[in-house]
Amino acid sequence: MAAKDIRFGEDARSRMVRGVNVLANAVKATLGPKGRNVVLEKSFGAPTITKDGVSVAKEIELADKFENMGAQMVKEVASRTNDDAGDGTTTATVLAQALIREGAKAVAAGMNPMDLKRGIDKAVVAAVNELKSISKPTADDKAIAQVGTISANSDESIGQIIADAMKEVGKEGVITVEEGSGLDNELDVVKGMQFDRGYLSPYFINNQQSQTADLDDPFILLHDKKISNVRDLLPVLEGVAKAGKPLLIVAEEVEGEALATLVVNTIRGIVKVVAVKAPGFGDRRKAMLEDMAVLTGGTVISEEVGLSLEKATIKDLGRAKKVQVSKENTTIIDGVGDKAAVDSRVAQIKTQIQDTSSDYDREKLQERVAKLAGGVAVIKVGASTEIEMKEKKDRVDDALHATRAAVEEGVVPGGGVALVRAVSALAGLKGANEDQNHGIQIALRAMEAPLREIVANAGEEPSVIVNKVKEGTGSFGYNAATGEFGDMLQFGILDPTKVTRSALQNAASIAGLMITTEAMVAEAPKKDEPAMGGAGGMGGMGGMGGMDF
């Protein structure tokens, strides 16, 4: 086992604080409407230019192992806030730096670290309650657009396109962000349930202009096995033909005689049919077929539930207002399923989302919710260069997460004002002893740090602005973009409550751990290995010159 380098007390904390300051100073330069960019070197290709706090934090590794531990712990604040709320990483870093710096000074002055931590925790709990009390729900598209604009560094076009996307697919709908091919941002909306499987034969096409198979008011057969024998399908086909409606078949596979018969019937106009493969694989395929059954009011024909294809009737089929099948995608629009059953299915999937620890599974489950609840919107980000594209895509991602958080828990006045108002409301808060009181004061001072940093990045004097904001009430604050004082809600400067709350809670959590750290252990640097000696002593072999070769 390698030797360890161990540091104690003030020596350990001071090194840790140095690491915190290096990382936080790099990250906080990006805060606010006049925050600066940070350029990140990449191992290959052009460097990345970003104003995204968590992207900056993730790139930082320090040479000194003890300083690096401090930096990595603050990086955890940014990452956790990003995971919880999708935004607010820079605010969380600024709060953590202020708490750690002041906390370390108090410990060095002889105060009890545990009491300081208890004081900080007490202040944070009270501040979170105050934030919740001043929070306002996001009632309209305008508020959603404003939140998106602020999070995208005051880019109104990004805020507006996110508001448009939410309006189209609903607040439960999935909105994805992709790199576009043009210079402008574009919004592409798919309503209904779409999955990535197309027609199994081009002979099913009935709309030559769009090269799609369009079915109006069709029946929908859902089967979890292969269909190769046409005899199994006859009862269903006869029932559909009598009803005079088209039919969509979604099965694991439709092949051989069955596919050929369906094509012939379609060409002759006897029954209008389109066959597609079921999406997904294994258990995910079964779940998606079940989703389609709920959406269309049908039943999955499966031996697992005692149903066989040859005994299926028209009552087992789903219905929808319209189905469109292209070469690569199938879209089911306006399924006739019971709304209560759909809502119940959505609630069930949401429970699975909360329980899963896999990001991939969570993403797939969220897609299923969207397909049941409303639809999918794709924001295609436009830019003139690849570097600009990456930077802009990061901002759109941030803005999207912020708007989702705003819809979830409401909004508070932005620009650091909400935290300053929380400080005013907690003026009379007291702890069990003087050290706890000092911890409370550390937390209250730290809550002013985001506003101070926003003002400093705008080139103004922080103390003057902060004092003027503290003199005001409600949503009165400072608009750093224009240099004006006024009502932040009227300026359209809003922060999601969830983002501000997560930033404060995560910063306090890590700060409490660092203040109460008394020892640090790291691997000792390896000393250079000495060169191998002794090989030079073979000179005596020169006496072998008399040997014949």
Curated annotation (Swiss-Prot):
InterPro entries: Chaperonin_Cpn60_CS, Cpn60/GroEL, Cpn60/GroEL/TCP-1, GroEL-like_apical_dom_sf, GROEL-like_equatorial_sf, TCP-1-like_intermed_sf. It comes from the Bacteria. It is found in: Cytoplasm. One of its GO terms (biological process) is protein refolding. One of its GO terms (cellular component) is cytoplasm. The keyword Isomerase applies. GO terms for molecular function: ATP binding; ATP-dependent protein folding chaperone; isomerase activity; unfolded protein binding. Disulfide bonds: none annotated. Keywords: ATP-binding, Chaperone, Cytoplasm, Isomerase, Nucleotide-binding. Together with its co-chaperonin GroES, plays an essential role in assisting protein folding. The GroEL-GroES system forms a nano-cage that allows encapsulation of the non-native substrate proteins and provides a physical environment optimized to promote and accelerate protein folding. Forms a cylinder of 14 subunits composed of two heptameric rings stacked back-to-back. Interacts with the co-chaperonin GroES. This is Chaperonin GroEL. The gene is groEL.
